[in-house]
Amino acid sequence: MQIEVAEFGKMSQSGNSLLKLIQNNDLPILDLLVREAVQNSLDAGMKVEGHDSVHVDIGIKDVDVPGFAKHLDGITERLIEKFGDSPQKAIYIEDANTTGLTGSLDFKYSPNSNIFKLIYGISMAQETPGAGGSWGLGKTVYFRVGIGLVVYYSHILNEDGQYQHRLAVTLVENEKLPNTIIPKSNEKVPSGIAWWGQRVSPDSDDTIPITDEAMIRDILDSLSIQPFEGERLGTKIIIPFIDEQQLLIKHDINPDDNKPWESNVADYIGVAIQRWYAPRLANKKYTYGKYLDGHINGQRLEKDDFLPLFLELQMMYNAAAIGSKTSRYIVNDIQIRNYFEHNKVNNAGRVAYRKFTKKELDMLAPLNGPSPYTCVNEKNPLGEQNAPMMAYVRRPGMIINYETDGEWCKGLHATEESEYLVAIFVPNSNTKLMNPDNEVVDLEAYLRKSEMADHTSWADIIIKGKPFDIVEKIRSQVRRKIKASYENKEEVKGKQGLNTLARNVGKMLLPPTGFGRRASSRNRGGGTKPTANKSSRGNSFTIVSQKYLDTGDLEVHFQMRLSKNVSAFTIELFIASEGGKISATDWESEDSVGTPFPAKITRISFPDTVGLFGRSAAQKSNRKVLHAVRIEKISEPVECLGILVFNCTDPHVQVEMLMKPEGSVVNGQ
């Protein structure tokens, strides 16, 4: 292959400047590689029909240094001298069911082609709607993984409908360092950038990818890489001469934690794919296109291989993206006003969250698994207590970041040492903006444009000269919903494994004030021995027993005693919380949970009470949920048994059943 050295000129890039374009020092280099490489592959698979997944395989191969170096004109001896005396490794990234490096071999005839954007161009933004890439700078991470040498191989269907193998090589190095690899010319300023391929013409210094299949197979064989065969389309990027120990430099955020994946590059990459692509990896429920069929060294990453945290994140993502009811997580709609064409309750998206125990995350002996903070390379800023962990993601399924403090977590309460609050926000990407511009027409485009080049955060932007605050409103709504939920709801404490959800028998607790006691909609029968709650005027309301019916409804048997001066009474359902009871009106308020009240009365009866009660009136909430019944009473003392049946759509809450007498001095009347 013949060499083409980039000329250094006005407004041109140099190797040194390219290597600094996306110098993200917050993430390990292997995380940056996984985020960029997998996203490129997923973007390349968007328009290929006939497949429900995008195949991505990342792994390590041996390098035959002399066999590889002989093909690179101008640096053959230098490579053999520098690397020939010791075993060398390469990282490869393979994708299939993708378009490949299409376009004219000579990029001058197709400057917007895939082949130019990946091999010969820089800062070429990805324009496909819903794509992950946007700035065109992320691919510079390839040059930082090894010595700056990258091999691009692709098998495509060309413009003539013929299958074609293509291969090119790029080298980007810091031209300011001593002992550079690219040969120097006395007549030219070093640029630090070179390509290898075949000459466009005998009298030109420009190169294009080679298409000689025999030569391509020989080059790939020197890198222990198999070519694509038959009709299989895709791309393989090979980065030779890596230093595995250098790539595994540890970020000692949690130095005492167990991190077995940091022992070798392949294991680290396997966890990194889970870390950043949990929503899409092996997820056949992914709603925005093809799921990610991930492999490490040719072995498929199955869900059984996931760390527990990442499997939970995927299930939470599905719950938020689909909006399905779930007994495992809390899912809240996020609504933003004044920016979108409609004001549906979930116009901005949904947030799913839950508090996990150490046992649920396999952190206890004998497994002794890592904490959530260790899994995502984040520090717990609170020390003895556990800070909340917030993830957010947009349509391509790559988690943008994990936050444990800052704007996403501000005001959220810490959990105790044995619990971890984990949340994920999934935007409603298709929501249209009220006043769009040519580039930003929906929420997905807004969030995409708001990202920095390394896609690690969202920040509000200006559209048509007007500053928007959509991201800030989303963060504020997410915080408020999570905070209100745990202030207004008593979380399920049942034992829940990864694949099964077992309901435990809980205790029926007395309410903090008023008459009545709680009926636990989440417990399958049983409870503490009931005790009567009496007033000084002789009124009382006692839960005698409760049981689940075959329909899933809860049947509550109670005993009631009412004095002569009680003219009527109301039996009402509330949701119990640490701060007191929550009525249906308060629950459904936009300033509170904002969803239909989860507990609904289906039947109430009083056996053997003929002539004791008068008219009854059902009371429904604003969202038509029957949550209370008011019943008139004769002017005589009454002592009777009653039966109330209700169902509850949210197992994360505990229902409180109260009786409110009217005409009673005790009741303030």
Report each predicted region and the residues it spans.
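Active-site-adjacent bridging/hinge elements
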Residues: 2-17, 90, 108-124, 205-215, ...
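Long, low-complexity, polar/charged, intrinsically disordered or flexibly structured peripheral segments
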Residues: 103-106, 111-115, 160-219, 223, ...
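Short, flexible loop/turn elements at secondary-structure junctions
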Residues: 43, 60-64, 95-100, 141-143, ...
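Short helix/loop capping segments that flank catalytic or ligand/cofactor-binding pockets
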Residues: 46, 66-69, 101-104, 161-162, ...
